Amino acid sequence: MKKYISILIIVLVSCESSSDLGLSGGRGETSFSAGGDSNTGIGGSMARFTIVDDYLYTIDSWTLKSYDISDQQNPLYKEDVNLGWGIETIFPYNGNLFIGAQSGMHIYNLDNKESPEWVSTYEHMTSCDPVVVQGDYAFVTLRGGTECQGFNNQLDIIDISDLVRPELFKTYSMINPHGLGVDDNCLFITEGEYGLKMFDISNLENIELIKHFEDISSIDVIPFNDILMVIGSDGFHQYNYDCELGEIEYISTIPINSL
């Protein structure tokens, strides 16, 4: 699993940089968390691939592909699943895949890991939409403009207690939201050049902005075990974080040059 984590971090940063800098390529479970599965790959909310147990799942603009990686020296391609248009992100949680598209969020179950099966789709206005999941709720940021089309810049909280019938729970306005990460009652949202936001989500009816770090340009974020991993246009940054105090403390940076 440590090997998987290292690979995921490197490729995630590469994908994030290429996408948001206008280069070819794709874009990058909540937090640096295992998304509720014991052997789940770790990545950001804008990831285009993930690992669940012995299977690797990748997406392109139209398709979900599955691979058996139980033999790491000989991975086996298994199946294509047609997802429709505008597919952007993939996030695993509790035996399901949550797939962000420009038109909505698709839910697929992994009862048959070789061939994920469609459960439902939550539709929204056309925009970019990374997704993370915790408990009975999915957190989705919608961003308008540029390649994302649309005009909405917001956080949608979606009730997924019934996976077959996901429903909008609450919407909050944002500036220019990109990726996001959740850790218990703490939600981080990256606002691109407008900084990084930390929210208290203990009351989803009225989430509270704890702090806005306006000087931290951010594209995606991964909170894990009190370490906050922030992907920016210039590299991969690590911070300690304390949600109760509303503080983060700089640790280190891995610089990433634009390709």
PLM features: what roles do these ranges have?
Residues 4-12:
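Sec-dependent N-terminal signal peptides
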